[in-house]
Amino acid sequence: MTWVSVAAMLNKRLGRRCADEGAAQRVVPALSEADRALGRLDGLARSLPNPDLFVAMYVRREAVLSSQIEGTQSSVDDVLAFEVDAPGWVQPADITETVNYVRAMNYGLQRLAELPISVRLIREIHEKLMQGVRGNHANPGELRRSQNWIGPGGSTLSDAIFVPPPPFEVENLLSDLEKFVHAESDIPALIKIGLIHAQFETIHPFLDGNGRVGRLLIAFYLCQKEILIKPVLYL
């Protein structure tokens, strides 16, 4: 089943009465509240006298938090010191990963003006994100050519918690995902971005950096759809 067919199926289901009234009663108010909150957030961003100045710091904070999920230890102060080449500053070994996140975010936002979310953009973002990063699995911008898996340290393919699709399916699955991103549908934007993120992480198209690219896609989608004028929400 492709994501285009999934979109069609969801459209049909959303057009009917929800079989689980309890779930509908929980989801609809939460979705409405989230939509209102996004509207208020976008309004605040538009009201700032210099939103780009605010966003510049906000992006760096998000870069630190997102990279910390992957185990890095750098701080916002480290990022700023790196950017100005502060004298006497001791550079953390993993600062490159955090600074690359800032660069990938800024690059992606600029590219959206001429290139919508696509497999090509995803690969370009990954290339920026993984440039010069330590380890044997960086492969900037390259889709994986070997099987990966997710599990605790020392786990193998046989006892992994989750095994993504085999590498020969990755390109077609990403193509399906790209079609789903741009398909016209009645799926609310916040639900759709959740589906996009979940499917991207399920495909796990790279050997490393999937989590960070997936989180960047959320911000890119909200800006591409003009739900937010600036990337001021990270999930």
Role assignments for model-derived ranges:
Residues 1-235:
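FIC/Doc superfamily catalytic core
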